[in-house]
Amino acid sequence: MAHVGNYSRNGYYPYYNNKFCGNFTELMYLIIVEKNRSDGYSNIKKHLVDNIETINYRNEKGWTALMIACAMCDKWSSFKTIRLLLKKGADVHIENNKGRTVLSLMVNIITENKFNIMDLLIDKGADINSQDNKNKTPLIHACKKELDDTYLHACYVLGKSVDPNLEKNDSKTVRYLLDKGADPNIEEHYGKTVLFYAARMKNQDKAYEISKTLIERGGNANHTNHYAETVLIYLCISCSHYSCELIQLLLDNGVDINHQNRIGFTALMCACINIKNPSNFETIKFMLDKGANINLKNNDGFTAFMNIFGNNYFDYIVPVIQIMLDYGADINDKNNNNVTVLMMAVKFAKNDKNMTVINFLLDKGADLEIRNDYDWTALFYACRYSNSSGNNDAVKLLLDYGANVNVNTLLGHTPLIIACQYADNESNIDTVKLLLEYGANPNLTNLDKNTALSVAITWLSKNRYEVVKLLLYYHADSNTYLYLNSEGTVREYNLLVWIVKNIKCNKLDLLMLLIEHGANYSDIKGYIFQENLDNGDIEKFMKFTNIMENIKLVKKSIIDCIPKRVPEIIFNTNSMISQLLSLKWKAYSSDYKDLITLKDLDIIDYLGVYDIDSLYDRIIDITKYAY
């Protein structure tokens, strides 16, 4: 029974379980409180005598008194009230705001008098094939909702099991509607018939039973909706689990297992995308056994095999990949953009499962050097996405398998340039470092003549300083130029000048870092620094450049001394090299025992020599590069 207060024309009242709305007539109110009072039915009967004109009024949700009485029969109102309303002229054809008639609503209601009520409605002319605002018929609604949601929720809250008789309610309702003339081939607004909804029921046994009944009663198993999807394709798209028995039923009744929808997807492709539990592994194998073509491609060039690969890998993906390969999938097949499964796998290499997949693909012969339409290899994908959807371990794995670290695209981009370009977000510093450790050349240029260093300086902000420092440590040329395309004209910029004019954060640190690694600032006019540095930074910059100038002078003095001092050291009779050469000559002399002096013995002891042979070996090793 409904627990509500007294009636008010402006009040909000429940019209169905815990759903409330306004614009309630007094007749509707009397119906929802009928079982609250012993004279509830009498009050309804008396009210209709003077207010018969309100019998077909609709509330805020478009529900009539008849709809409320039918939906809540045995809970709030009685079966005899329904009979009274129909006798007094309640219209069975009125639609609520969603376009549903009272008969359409009844197919989803759980009540002992459900079929008695439906008999009354049909006897009064209710249309068994009426369509709501989305062209759904009562038969479609019977399969669209397996059991009343409120009933199921109540069972869950109270800890009660679902009544087995009610579990069969949907099947019974479907058969009832078919017996009363329901058409199983009417299409709703997307072109789906009732069979589309029946096949995707959560209860697989029920899905099979009702689908079989619909087909036996004339339902077209080979019908396609507005997207050119068969029931089988729709089933594989919308469900995470489905039975092989149901698939066999559809195939037995004419469904083409290799039919492609409007965008080229087959049922097998959809199953591979929607593979969320181990049972679907058996389903995929079943479809392959039944002749599903593993090498068909959709409009984007993806095969079923390619559709397995995404950003949510699962525990049993490797066996799925293996079964697909066993049935003839090409591990190096490409989509319309020439992307391979290896490229997709490394792009989404975020966790251990994905790394297992990449390892497996490489072991099975996935080609590292295939290029997509951007001329990228798998290594480019790994470097670009190593910090977002990817994984730095994937970069290392590809390099360990022999990926060319200095491969370049038609635009001249290398993996290092790409990693530097995106090192603030999708890539990271560790990827840049890894590439450099594996021999990436930081001085290779793209077609714009830019190196990894110039790209890092112009593209990065958060990690700019660290990446630049890393590149310089690995001998990036600090005197490289920056080339930027401005309105179709490529302009050349000195890196120091560009930094001082365009970078706001840490520009002084970056300038000093480049100069420390040899960037030439002597040709740059001083006013450029003065105009673009803060006063405090100008003072620091001047002190730093003075120190660097002194360091240069010291280095120059050392270098200038080398030609003079080296001969003096080499040819000095007291130098170590001279003494070693003398000892070598003595050792090879036949009377070496007479020639060796006490000073020679000190050298022999220092070298750890224990006999004449070891003396030969040590002296030869030390003096072979002495000339």
Swiss-Prot record:
ANK repeats lie at residues 61-94, 98-130, 153-186, 190-223, 228-259, 263-296, 300-333, 337-370, 374-407, 411-444, 448-480, 491-523. InterPro entries: Ankyrin_rpt, Ankyrin_rpt-contain_sf. Gene3D superfamilies: Ankyrin repeat-containing domain (1.25.40.20). Keywords: ANK repeat, Repeat. The keyword Repeat applies. Pfam families: Ank_2. PANTHER family: MOLTING PROTEIN MLT-4. This is Putative ankyrin repeat protein L122.
